């Protein structure tokens, strides 16, 4: 089973593409979890990690994907993603590229993100690492893109 979780508070006001994102996630996952609807009006970094951890904890999938509400998967990526899940069961995560798009044909690789998490084999993953308190850790150590399949 594959779960995707995301967070948002007031996506209409922020003009987030939330409806499109949720439809995209439903096409990929067996369940979609949304947290953060009760986020405090005053922003704090620790709230991000808490909401991400809530999403991970509520997810029932063997694999769990953390998606920001403005992240999307390309429809042609599904088969490749499912193959990566099958071939990476001994790892706590899979890193995927994050692209920054400027125009339809102009984009660049921005970074690699460890947002696909193996909850079945590593249920103790925490989303409390990094300067923003929301990167994936295992046993207190940051899960880095260089330590997992890409």
What residue spans do the PLM features occupy?
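Catalytic-site signature of metal-activated, phosphate-bearing donor transferases
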Residues: 53, 76-150
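Short linear motifs at secondary-structure transitions and domain/linker junctions
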Residues: 6-11, 39-42, 70-71, 93, ...
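Active-site-proximal specificity loops/subdomain of glycosyltransferases
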Residues: 2-20, 24, 30-66, 72-77
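Weak global preference for isoleucine
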Residues: 4, 33, 48, 65, ...
């Amino acid at each position: 089973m594959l779960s995707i979780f995301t967070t948002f508070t007031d996506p209409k006001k922020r003009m987030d593409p939330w409806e499109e994102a949720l439809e995209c996630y439903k096409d990929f996952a067996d369940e979609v979890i949304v947290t953060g609807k009760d986020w405090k009006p005053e922003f704090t970094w620790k709230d991000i990690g808490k909401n991400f951890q809530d999403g991970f904890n509520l997810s029932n999938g063997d694999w769990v994907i953390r998606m920001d509400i403005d992240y999307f998967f390309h429809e042609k990526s599904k088969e490749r993603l499912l193959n990566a899940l099958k071939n990476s069961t001994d790892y706590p995560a899979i890193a995927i590229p994050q692209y920054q798009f400027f125009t339809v044909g102009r984009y660049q690789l921005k970074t690699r993100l460890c947002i696909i998490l193996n909850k079945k084999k590593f249920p103790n993953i925490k989303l409390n690492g990094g300067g923003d308190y929301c990167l994936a850790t295992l046993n207190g150590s940051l899960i880095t893109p260089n330590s997992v399949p890409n």
